[in-house]
């Protein structure tokens, strides 16, 4: 959704490899070891892949809410000073993209 694919490609190659494999694992119905449920969405269908490289934290957020596809909602380098919590602007973007994905699925567009 949105700029997620472009954002993913801008990350370090090792991070892209981890996220790519984690998304492949999600497509098989399983969960990668670096994946956890992202809280605040009411169920376990929005997940976050967490990767750290050279002191930097990276996140890929996706949903398995739809039968037709695993939808990547947001990919970013975490720069929050508030500990492990995902920053509010990122959470707002994830929520907006999830809403848009839900609308597209209801319209019959995967």
Predicted regions, residues:
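Hydrophobic/aromatic beta-strand elements that line small-molecule binding cavities or substrate pockets
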Residues: 60-62
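Basic, Lys/Arg-enriched alpha-helical interface segments
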Residues: 1-57, 66-69, 78-110
